[in-house]
Amino acid sequence: YYVFNGADEDATEYWEKMTQVRLEYFPNPGPAATAVRVKGMPYEGQLIQIEGVALRGDSRKKRERIMPEGSWDWSISVPLSQGWKIGDRVFVGGQISADKQGHSVGVGDLAEQTRNIYKFIGSVLHDAGASMDDIVRLKVCYKYDSKEQSGQNFCDKIIDLTHEFFEQPGPALTAFGVDLLYPGLDLEIDAMAIVGHKGRALKSRELGGRYQPDLFADGVGVADETYVAGQVALGSDNSILCKGDAYGQAVIVFKRLAKVLAYDQLSMDDIVKLNIFIVGDGVDVEEEFNAILLAWAESAPHAHPAMTPVRVHELPQPGLLVQADCVALK
């Protein structure tokens, strides 16, 4: 996640300069990566945040880099990968609608871009011996403050199109509004799949409303791992709860995480990775972030997960201030 407040036409050069520094640390071949422009970090002045997943031990002996023929490429030479298969896990890096030179494809056509991206995701999975049915987690980063000519916002349209590629029960889905890497891009999607295990679709009727359609699970359990979809403060009629109150929404969000985990016989103490997406109107979101941390401390006093907090431009419905998803291990 990185911050760049300049013009879209200058964003690519900014990313390339930033990436030259990152290349000092990446191996070759490098990881599958997702890079999106966010509105900010928890504190003013912070410009970049990087998180990662690493596997070691015997799994390193079974690593397979996935670089399908026909995939898009970046605007500069980088050792990044489209995907990795490590044991029974497939990590799909952020996919965009671009060509071999990193030029945006399908500019002005959200449906084309969305379908291109799912085609790229499918290619990575296919080359890794997996399919869309194996996806447990899906992250949709869409162009904020954008609507189709019909008036439908981008998030809703993308999720509608996503129905073409999944059967029920679908993966755990999290969506939020950002800016993108190259001018003309409308979205970026990454995914994780686990092959050879029957997943447990987690659905709780006690959560209230949600922006994800019924196709998608509240969470997905596979073996000893549980992936919880993005949770927000929506009532059963999909109205915003605790309007204008980041603390109040965070309390609701964390209660929802706990309910989904309980459905898989887990507790908040089992969370190993927590992602928090924050919306705020001020210069920064320090006050909102501190309120969210207070809500977390009250909700899960004995839990100490790795946490990534990011300020995004928007969440799937106006008025939502907090979204959280997580990974838990038994």
For each of these PLM feature ranges, what is it?
Residues 3-136, 142-255, 259-272, 278-330:
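N-terminal presequence-like segments and the immediate start of the first folded domain
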